Amino acid sequence: MPTLSVFMDVPLAHKLEGSLLKTYKQDDYPNKIFLAYRVCMTNEGHPWVSLVVQKTRLQISQDPSLNYEYLPTMGLKSFIQASLALLFGKHSQAIVENRVGGVHTVGDSGAFQLGVQFLRAWHKDARIVYIISSQKELHGLVFQDMGFTVYEYSVWDPKKLCMDPDILLNVVEQIPHGCVLVMGNIIDCKLTPSGWAKLMSMIKSKQIFPFFDIPCQGLYTSDLEEDTRILQYFVSQGFEFFCSQSLSKNFGIYDEGVGMLVVVAVNNQQLLCVLSQLEGLAQALWLNPPNTGARVITSILCNPALLGEWKQSLKEVVENIMLTKEKVKEKLQLLGTPGSWGHITEQSGTHGYLGLNSQQVEYLVRKKHIYIPKNGQINFSCINANNINYITEGINEAVLLTESSEMCLPKEKKTLIGIKL
């Protein structure tokens, strides 16, 4: 007699963007290229790791004084202090006033998981979330699984080929009172002083709760302070907010999942209350965060010589990415590819938009075996001397083949004020 399975009614899960990598791996084409890795890549096509991280990791592994005990639920205290100083600056108003703290988490996914659980329990009026489209696959489902209604928004204008500050202001103007607003790094969204003032005013008057995502500080401009300028604006205006801080990508410790949920409160008393609740939630989620990556990062951040080496390694990575973008733009211009390609070099960070429409992206994936996310945002560190010609020639071919049809015209998204996930 056959045994009934507990799992017989379990269906296949909805495929996420991660299935693009699965499709790539199943492709037998010898010249296939994947341009959507989350990690920073070297010119040799391997995940980038700072040399100072490798050196420090080796030293720690050989330290006979380490007893490899479990960390406290809140994490390594020295790591939290060093990471907060990195994020806000040692002389930050919030740090001086003792109204900022953090919980050591299992990467940025752990930070969102912890933060969303807290909001579900203690911010019960907020059941609507607007999340920037670049984070929707990674973190939108966390909110959705917790019972939030999730909408995505984008500040990328496919016609102007830039991050448009007017779109951001329009989004905030139209989203409902009391919702959660998840914001990534909008360093390329050139808000004027009056634009910043308007943004702050709307968020404050609508009692919107900001939840920032800082996944790779230092890999946008190589200036650690400039990369988190948006947080300084909000701190100076007395806002309270959450921030997911990931330190895996900018240190090249991808396998450790090193992150922190940062809490900025109105005062120290409220901060302590929030942290106490987060400790209980973290205890149920993972009890003890991972140790090794946090020790490596703390050792570097607390040693001026090692910190200088790390900053220099970030500068070299950013310069290499900028050079890659310049080469891509120049090659497309030399090929006579229709369109303006200046937007490629005007974007900061490892990831950026190519400015292609959905038909052109589909052509590259299906015909050229160049795997690009549907939104056309790629990881430029995946482009190197071995594949740049094939990639740019493929883009040129895709644009030329769709140029004469209406499909080649960028269609304005209807996601400016949100599409429900």
UniProtKB/Swiss-Prot annotation:
It holds the Pfam family Aminotran_1_2. SUPFAM superfamilies: PLP-dependent transferases (SSF53383). Signal peptide: none annotated. It comes from the Eukaryota. The keyword Transferase applies. Its cofactor is pyridoxal 5'-phosphate. The modification N6-(pyridoxal phosphate)lysine is found at residue 249. It catalyses: L-aspartate + 2-oxoglutarate = oxaloacetate + L-glutamate. InterPro entries: Aminotransferase_I/II_large, Asp_trans, PyrdxlP-dep_Trfase, PyrdxlP-dep_Trfase_major, PyrdxlP-dep_Trfase_small. One of its GO terms (molecular function) is pyridoxal phosphate binding. It is found in: Cytoplasm. GO terms for biological process: aspartate biosynthetic process. Keywords: Aminotransferase, Cytoplasm, Pyridoxal phosphate, Transferase. One of its GO terms (cellular component) is cytosol. Its EC number is 2.6.1.1. The keyword Cytoplasm applies. In eukaryotes there are cytoplasmic, mitochondrial and chloroplastic isozymes. Belongs to the class-I pyridoxal-phosphate-dependent aminotransferase family. Homodimer. This is Putative aspartate aminotransferase, cytoplasmic 2. It comes from Homo sapiens. The gene is GOT1L1.
